Amino acid sequence: KSGELLNLNKNNNFQIEKLEGSNCAVCECENNIGSNYCKHCGADLYEINDKSQFESIIKNNKSINYILEKFNIGKILLTSSLSLGILLVVSFFIKGFISLEFSEISYIINPLHIIMALNLGVLDGYSSTMVGSGSIEAHIGMLILLIMPVISIIISNFIFLKKENKDLNSVILNSIGFGISYGLMLAVISIFATVKSNPMDMIDYGLAINFRYRFSSLLINGFIIGFLTTYIFSFKKKYRNNNIYIDILKNAINTIAIGYILVFIILLILTLSDSSFLNEIGLYGYLDKFNIGIILSQLTAYVWEFANFIPISINNNIISILNTGIFFNTKLIFYSMIALSLLIILISGCNIKYKYKENGKKAILIFAISYAIIMGILAMFSYITVGGNISLLEMNNYKASIFMGTSITSTMIISFIYSYVVSWIGYKLNTF
């Protein structure tokens, strides 16, 4: 009678969710927060959602049209197209800058290549002359490049998909659908953006250049970037208690994001006061070529990985907990980052204890797996490599290799063990 929230029994397949706000959708009158029914017209202030959409689709053998309807395929394609359209406009401006500053190479670069570079695709290059051939593989995993794809995805999601995210299931479906669509579009673009060139000043030597972005790298990167951006943008606090896996995945993302931001701030303060530590790790020379924000955004990823006991390579120098090869003051900086990561993950373990007292081991395991996956994605996006053999006219093959970053496999294994142990300790330390 009072309209207060009733103690309703839960069904395994359905759940009751409160609608956003306190105004009735029928009569638009305001109600008390927590009310189950409108006190003016009696309309429901909650909705019943099916928790087993995926199972019901499979078990009932629904038609393809039904599945496509659940995925909002039309809106998803519009959203993906708009995201790439925004990137295309940005790429024309970047192309103009390249033409002004690097006119000697601008003729082989078009806006489609810039779009793929912004999504951190792997570049495969081949060259041949009358006297030999060579190949090169390059991945410029500069995290700052992701800013434009993320912004374009957020804008397009706000325009087309935001209203379609009515509950947790729709958020997951739309995130997966957008990730697939965005990744496929990038991969298809890579097929049509292959470059074959015969420089006029080298035509007497029969020099031919061929390069393209790797199909698989853009497909995978596009899915991950599209899925995570859409998921994080669409996720709401009211979904946190609906699914332990989704809640803890968000917790793992937040843990790494907080760690990254804090490390970036600390490194920025240190660099502005005394940048000598950059010289010790071989990055000081880049300050003249790149903005300090670009360098620190990249270095932050590597330092956070080191703080998780993961060996990192900077300018082909291995830095690990056992072998730093740096002076004492810089060692203190790196070791303080380890202490910071310990504190952040301990707090995450305490929070898990607070929310999931009855499912402690399961919750910690889910957190460690989620944490390892996100750390693996960070390692996959942030590594920089240029390697291969380049055939020169003097008939010599010069082999060169540059690598900065970490191994994706070792990153996932070490971060899983590290996060599991530390979060479990934090879980046990929480006695409240």
Where are these regions (language model features)?
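Alpha-helical transmembrane segments of multi-pass integral membrane proteins
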Residues: 162-240, 272-283, 356-432
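Cys/His-rich metal-coordination motifs, chiefly Zn-binding "fingers/knuckles"
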Residues: 1-55
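Long, glycine/tryptophan/cysteine-rich extracytoplasmic
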Residues: 74-148, 192-213, 271-338, 379-414, ...
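Transmembrane alpha-helical segments in integral membrane proteins
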Residues: 67-86, 134-166, 221-241, 329-357, ...
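Alpha-helical transmembrane segments and their helix-start/interface "positive-inside/aromatic belt" motifs
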Residues: 63-89, 166-180, 245-261, 357-369
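Transmembrane alpha-helical segments of multi-pass membrane transport proteins and ion-pumping complexes
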Residues: 84, 88, 92, 96, ...
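Acidic, serine/threonine- and glycine-rich low-complexity intrinsically disordered segments
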Residues: 236-295
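Intrinsically disordered, low-complexity cytosolic tails and juxtamembrane linkers
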Residues: 48-71
